[in-house]
């Protein structure tokens, strides 16, 4: 934002700007004054270290007795079939990621969620649990759910804003890191009981912070909208965009930023805090071929994600 103001200032003009959007105003004001800031503020490192000490243990996983950092947590929306009442995981396919360069893909069993590395042209997964999974035959496509039990189809969006059910999410897989620096490698695994317990621990810690909740719980405005998203998918409040571990992270980070006395350092942190919300919510997707997150508003709309990824 503020391109005309910033470029005019580069030409030594005295600039004055107005905007009705407080976020745009904050960003542009920061851009205009950034040249006067220092290159480094120790307060920023202190905030990162303080929050990391509290949140990083909740982003660890155990593999063969050893602990590793989790890079991405994979979630999937679960919806009940209107006809047979079975619970259906809304997977667009059963592929977590792929690499054209390595000619590999990482897929998971739709029954037990075990993750396998296969050649990229493989169409069927023969899992060690004894079940077969057709990799591209997902249960969700273009807003329509197909029940694997009764084969009936239904829309996942509600017909009106008031009848939409709040999404139910299930943690089913993780991408974790082995090694450090140039020797660091990325691996996939299904979630185990220890991973679920870490999430529940985060939920309990969040409950202890209820009196200082910084995540906005106000209703998303309905007036003046061109479509019903995200309310037709059960997202009615801004807090509904985040799971409990993300809310804990946001609260701890927000509280730490509030304590920073240096105004310039705090402004830098506030801007980074605002920007990182789009990649730390349950509307964050995963770019399968690039193995990285695709933030909220990457296509300039409330695109509903049935298989979001939670970033460390």
Mark where each language-model region is.
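Conserved SAM-dependent methyltransferase scaffold
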Residues: 4-5
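Long, structured ligand/cofactor-binding scaffold of large enzymes
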Residues: 1
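Nucleic-acid modification enzymes, centered on SAM-dependent nucleic-acid methyltransferases
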Residues: 9-312
């Amino acid at each position: 934002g503020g391109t005309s103001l910033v470029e005019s200032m580069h030409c030594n003009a005295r600039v004055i700007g107005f905007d009705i959007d407080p976020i745009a105003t904050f960003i542009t004001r920061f851009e205009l004054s950034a040249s006067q800031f220092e290159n480094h503020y120790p307060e920023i490192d202190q905030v990162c270290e303080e929050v990391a000490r509290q949140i990083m243990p909740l982003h660890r996983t155990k593999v063969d007795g050893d602990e590793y950092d989790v890079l991405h947590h994979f979630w999937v929306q679960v919806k009940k079939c209107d006809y047979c009442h079975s619970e259906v995981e809304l997977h667009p396919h059963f592929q977590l990621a792929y690499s054209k360069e390595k000619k590999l893909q990482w897929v998971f069993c739709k029954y037990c969620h075990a993750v396998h590395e296969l050649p990229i042209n493989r169409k069927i997964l023969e899992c060690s649990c004894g079940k077969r999974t057709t990799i591209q035959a997902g249960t969700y496509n273009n807003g329509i759910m197909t029940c694997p039990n009764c084969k009936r189809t239904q829309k996942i969006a509600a017909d009106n804003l008031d009848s939409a059910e709040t999404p139910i999410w299930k943690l089913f897989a993780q991408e974790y890191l082995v090694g450090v620096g140039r020797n660091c490698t990325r691996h996939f695994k299904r979630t185990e009981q220890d991973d679920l317990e870490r999430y529940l621990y985060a939920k309990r810690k969040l409950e202890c912070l209820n009196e200082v909740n910084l995540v906005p719980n106000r209703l998303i405005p309905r007036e003046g909208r061109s479509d019903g998203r995200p309310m037709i998918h059960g997202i009615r409040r801004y807090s509904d965009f985040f799971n409990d571990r993300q809310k804990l992270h946001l609260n701890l980070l927000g509280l730490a930023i509030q304590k920073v006395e240096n105004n310039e350092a705090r402004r830098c942190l506030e801007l980074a805090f605002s920007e990182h919300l789009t990649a730390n919510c349950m509307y964050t997707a995963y770019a399968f071929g690039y193995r990285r997150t695709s933030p909220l508003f990457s296509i300039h709309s409330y695109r509903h994600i049935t298989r979001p990824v939670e970033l460390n």
